[in-house]
């Protein structure tokens, strides 16, 4: 899980999800692409 000020999709499989006001990126193909804004 990377914590970044600006989250961007790294690959085509990355999805932007908003949970409890926190923007997250989840990726099925590569779990290393997981990110959280903060």
From Swiss-Prot:
The keyword Repressor does not apply. InterPro entries: Ribosomal_bL36, Ribosomal_bL36_sp. This is Large ribosomal subunit protein bL36. The keyword Ribonucleoprotein applies. SUPFAM superfamilies: Ribosomal protein L36. GO terms for biological process: translation. Belongs to the bacterial ribosomal protein bL36 family.
């Amino acid at each position: 899980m990377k914590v970044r000020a600006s989250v961007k999709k790294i690959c085509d499989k990355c999805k932007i999800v908003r949970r409890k006001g926190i923007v997250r990126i989840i990726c099925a193909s590569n779990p290393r692409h997981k990110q959280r804004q903060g």
